[in-house]
Every structure is written in structure tokens, then in C-alpha cells.
Amino acid sequence: MDFRLFLRQILRALAFLAPAIFLGGCLEYFTTVTPLTGINVYDANQVSQDERGIYSIAKDKIVKTKIQTKILGTSGLSNLNVDVESFYGDVYLIGVVPDAEHKEKLVELAKNTSGVNKIYTYIRFPKDGGECEGNLAIMLNLKNNLFKDSIISGTSVRVSVVQCNVVFTGIITDIEQEKHAIWYAKHITGVRDVYSFLKILKD
């Protein structure tokens, strides 16, 4: 993947974050630090390099969109603060919500979405955040490292950064891909913890 494509993806990421930047303190009142979710540098060539077939990708995209639409219509929940991923109908909810009640709402709306098999969560509350101002730096640093690694580059690995914690989701073909991703994350300044939902695709 060339530098121009990487630059375009970064500009997309910054455009996505613009509302959060302009809302400033108001948004941070609820989230402490807005998680970087929904930013995936592999979207541009996802279909050609994703380990899933086109049919499975399309089905997962529908599930993801349905859940995001429900989040949009639910008071206290925001797609800016919660990332939704779906792989073979297994749904991953990652981000920050105001409290346990809203976490329950989030899980319930995913449960009641057709096409969902299982639900996995990495949900934190504002009080869990502490001092964390490095989400963007962590994300860009990690993405840059993953791009350069021939073992990981071009896979469907997704990265979310929540309160300076790195969360991986996606489908991989080799355990070494997960090991490399985790190693990079653990060696980035400011990362508090690393959690992996990565699953190996079995033949």
C-alpha cells in the first residue's frame, strides 16, 4: 500500500474526528477521552484482501449498519464513542458508554438484531479513563507499524483505541499475525493495556 493511500486514510480519520474536536469539552464530559473507533486503514482494499468471502463481508456489513443505526437512535449512545465490528455474525462492541445501564442497552439492541450470532464487548465507563490524551498518537503510531509489517499488512485486522487501551478485532490466518500486532501495541508509549479478539480462520 503506497504513501498516498495511507495519507488519504489519515485525512479520512481526521475528518471523522472533526465533530469531536469542535465539540471539545462537552463531549469529553461524557467520555473522558473520546475513543478512536471506526477508523480502519484497510477499508480501501478490504474486499480484495479480507480473509472472508464477499458474501460474508456483505452480510457482516449489513449487521454492522443495523446496529449502528440503532445506536444513532438511542439516547446516551453514540457511534463516535462505540465501535461496532462483525465477523461471520459475531459482533464486537468496543468503546465508552456513560454507565452500566447504557452498556446493557447497547448489548440488548445488538442482541435484537437479525444476523447476530454472538456478542463480545470491551466497554468502559468515563470514570475508568483517568488521564489519557494519547489516543490519536497511539492509533497513528500503531497503524504505521502494521503497514510496514509484511505479515500483518493487508489483513482484516481492526484497531480501536479506548482510553489509551488497544483493542484488536478481525480474522487472521496465522497466530504470528496476532503476536506481531500485540508486540507493536505493547511497545508504543502511552499504551496501558492490549486486548485481542482476533480469531484464526480455520480451513
Model-derived segments and spans:
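Bacterial Sec-type N-terminal signal peptides, specifically the leucine/valine-rich hydrophobic h-region
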Residues: 20-23
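N-terminal targeting leaders
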Residues: 2-7, 11-15, 25-203
